[in-house]
């Protein structure tokens, strides 16, 4: 078998050898093939290979293609990095010198002074040379690649005339919205010139293309929100529901000087027909409460409520568990659960009625709390709640009321709820809100009163409905 295959291949090669003269009898075709091969090699060396070499060996790439834009850009970026290094070192040295002078340190004297001057002059010369090198390289890039946004930005960075810088930065952004340095420079420039519409346009670009820069962009948007003219433009932009709207409201409280600025912005959005969602309100209300600004937080929440809810508002919000909780401080909020579920479920015995339904799985349960912040004035009150269910546990559930700013100060609590309760019954407990600043607001919560891990085992289900809070006569 092997012998037959070998003989077959030998006959093929022998036939080719006998007919190889066909390549020599037509020198024109042979020459044409040679020229085509050389042309292809030239294309590879001057077009394809420089792209491969440019990131790691720009000098070799430029030797093959002297005007290759990618290699020129790599060299320009290296020069820029060196220039930034020199500028940073100079800034640090100047700040150190000023710090020494402020502490009363003696200036350098004697033979060291000429060396310092010479070193400073040499760094200044190097910076000047680097700027010129970047300018030349960027110009060459644009000759070969007029749409290169990065080259326009490099040119802008080595210019000194503000109008020229502004023009070049605009050209960079016009060619690519992902040229973030140019976008941010223009954002800052337009902000300081009070061109708020252009500032918002550029902020929109950055927040869409570079969300990681939101901390820096939000500082500008926060200041625009505090300007009457800027706020109107910002409201219009937010009403269009940009993708970064929730991020904006989450960061806004940390980027304003006046505590009422977010509220004024939200009220304006509400008036424009695009009110903030509960998720957008929550960071602001939580921020106010963390600063112990309880009354401003409650006032803000009231102003952002729909008109129809204000007319039926009582001391407890949503006392019959009819609407889905928003998670806001003055509404029901549910903590993270493990092996338990909480829902506002329909009641089978009441048409269109709902109740709080809690079910526990078998095993250890994490049931942090169902909670709501109340604003009760000092005095005596009575709280009632309907309850039924079956709970098997060492320690059961409690309703507890405490002072918001000192939650260890328990005002009142129910007995532990556990065992079997097949039919609805009403729980009642009286309490008194003290005249102390820490109790300006109160914290009502339903919790599993477990004191240790071994007491976290609970099973069963429970229903609650119709919380009623009434003030008693003094």
Q: Residue locations for each model-derived region?
A:
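Structural motif corresponding to the intra-repeat A-B loop/turn of tetratricopeptide repeats
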Residues: 82, 128, 159-162, 193, ...
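Residue-level signature for tetratricopeptide repeat
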Residues: 78, 124, 158, 188-189, ...
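Alpha-helical adaptor scaffolds
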Residues: 119-127, 138-142, 149-160, 219-225
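Alpha-helical repeat scaffolds
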Residues: 58-62, 92-100, 128-140, 164-173, ...
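Short extracytoplasmic
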Residues: 60-92
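A structural motif in tetratricopeptide-repeat
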Residues: 64-68, 145, 176-179, 210-211, ...
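Alpha-solenoid helical repeat scaffolds
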Residues: 73-74, 150-154, 180-188, 201, ...
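Extracellular and organelle-lumenal recognition/adhesion modules and their flexible linkers in secreted
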Residues: 11-18, 23-62, 66, 73, ...
């Amino acid at each position: 078998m092997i012998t037959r295959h070998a003989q077959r291949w030998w006959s093929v090669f022998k036939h080719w050898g006998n007919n190889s003269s066909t390549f020599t009898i037509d020198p024109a075709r042979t020459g044409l093939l040679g020229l085509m091969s050389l042309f292809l090699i030239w294309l590879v060396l001057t077009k394809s290979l420089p792209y491969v070499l440019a990131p790691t060996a720009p000098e070799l790439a430029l030797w093959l293609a002297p005007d290759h834009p990618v290699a020129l850009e790599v060299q320009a970026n290296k020069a820029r990095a060196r220039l930034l290094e020199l500028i940073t070192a100079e800034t640090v040295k100047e700040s150190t010198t000023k710090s020494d002078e402020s502490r009363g340190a003696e200036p350098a004297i004697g033979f060291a002074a000429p060396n310092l001057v010479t070193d400073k002059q040499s760094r200044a010369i190097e910076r000047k040379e680097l700027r010129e090198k970047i300018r030349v390289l960027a110009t060459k890039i644009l000759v070969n690649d007029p749409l290169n946004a990065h080259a326009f930005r490099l040119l802008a960075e080595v210019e000194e005339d503000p109008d020229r810088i502004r023009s070049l930065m605009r050209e960079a952004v016009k060619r690519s919205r992902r040229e973030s340095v140019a976008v941010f420079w223009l954002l800052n420039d337009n902000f300081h010139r009070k061109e708020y519409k252009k500032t918002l346009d550029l902020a929109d670009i950055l927040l869409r293309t570079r969300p990681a820069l939101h901390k820096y962009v939000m500082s500008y948007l926060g200041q625009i929100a505090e300007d009457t003219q800027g706020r109107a433009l910002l409201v219009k932009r937010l009403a269009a529901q940009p993708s970064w709207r929730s991020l904006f409201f989450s960061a806004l409280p940390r980027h304003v000087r006046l505590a009422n600025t977010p509220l004024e912005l939200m009220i304006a959005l509400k008036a424009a027909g695009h009110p903030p969602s509960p998720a957008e309100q929550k960071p602001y209300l939580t921020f106010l409460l963390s600063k112990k600004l309880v009354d401003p937080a409650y006032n803000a929440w009231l102003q952002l409520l729909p008109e129809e809810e204000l007319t039926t508002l009582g001391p407890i919000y949503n006392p019959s568990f009819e609407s889905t909780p928003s998670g806001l401080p003055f509404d029901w909020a549910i903590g993270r659960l493990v092996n338990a579920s909480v829902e506002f479920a329909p009641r089978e015995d009441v048409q269109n009625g709902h109740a709080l339904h809690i079910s526990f799985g078998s095993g250890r349960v994490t049931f942090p709390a169902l909670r709501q912040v109340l604003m009760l004035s000092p005095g005596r009150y009575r709280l009632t709640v309907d309850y039924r269910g079956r709970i098997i546990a060492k320690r059961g559930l409690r309703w507890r009321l405490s002072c918001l700013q000192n939650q260890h100060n328990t005002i009142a609590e129910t007995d532990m709820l556990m065992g079997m309760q097949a039919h609805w019954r009403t729980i009642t407990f009286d309490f008194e809100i003290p005249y102390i600043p820490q109790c300006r607001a109160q914290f009502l919560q339903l919790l599993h009163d477990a004191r240790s891990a071994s007491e976290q085992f609970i099973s069963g289900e429970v229903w609650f409905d119709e919380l009623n809070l009434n003030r008693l006569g003094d």
